[in-house]
Amino acid sequence: MALNEQDVARIARLARIELTPDQRSRAQDELNGILHLIERLQAADTEGVEPLAHPLSAHQDIALRLRPDAVTETPSEDRRAELLANAPDARDGLFLVPKVIE
C-alpha cells in the first residue's frame, strides 16, 4: 500500500495541519516508508513465537530498565491551581480545549 499526494492532503486536513508542498512531499515519503516497514513486519513468519511482554525481555543479559509505577507527588489544590493557571482556558477545575472532532 502506498499513499499518494491526495491521501497525504486528506490526512493533513483531518489532522487539521497545514502543509506546504515540500512538507507534503516529505510527509508522503516518510509515511510510505513507515507503511513499507509495516508490510515487512506483517510478512514475517511468527508461527510458534511466543509473544513478549516487552521487547527487551527477549535478551537474558539485559535487565528491564523500566521505572517502578510509583506516585512521585501527592495531589494538592495548590498544585492543581498552579497547573490550571497556565491553561489558556479552564473552568470548574478542568482544562477546556477547542473541539477537534466534528
Curated annotation (Swiss-Prot):
Uppermost EC category: ligase
Catalysis: reaction(s): L-glutamyl-tRNA(Gln) + L-glutamine + ATP + H2O = L-glutaminyl-tRNA(Gln) + L-glutamate + ADP + phosphate + H(+); L-aspartyl-tRNA(Asn) + L-glutamine + ATP + H2O = L-asparaginyl-tRNA(Asn) + L-glutamate + ADP + phosphate + 2 H(+)
Native organism: Bordetella petrii (strain ATCC BAA-461 / DSM 12804 / CCUG 43448)
GO biological process, one term: translation
GO molecular function terms listed in the Swiss-Prot or TrEMBL record: asparaginyl-tRNA synthase (glutamine-hydrolyzing) activity; ATP binding; glutaminyl-tRNA synthase (glutamine-hydrolyzing) activity
Superkingdom of origin: Bacteria
Name this polypeptide is given: Aspartyl/glutamyl-tRNA(Asn/Gln) amidotransferase subunit C
General function of this protein: Allows the formation of correctly charged Asn-tRNA(Asn) or Gln-tRNA(Gln) through the transamidation of misacylated Asp-tRNA(Asn) or Glu-tRNA(Gln) in organisms which lack either or both of asparaginyl-tRNA or glutaminyl-tRNA synthetases. The reaction takes place in the presence of glutamine and ATP through an activated phospho-Asp-tRNA(Asn) or phospho-Glu-tRNA(Gln).
Keywords assigned by UniProt, alphabetized: ATP-binding, Ligase, Nucleotide-binding, Protein biosynthesis
Family: Belongs to the GatC family.
Xref: InterPro entries: Asp/Glu-ADT_sf_sub_c, GatC
This enzyme's EC code(s): 6.3.5.-
Assembly, per entry: Heterotrimer of A, B and C subunits.
Any Pfam family: GatC
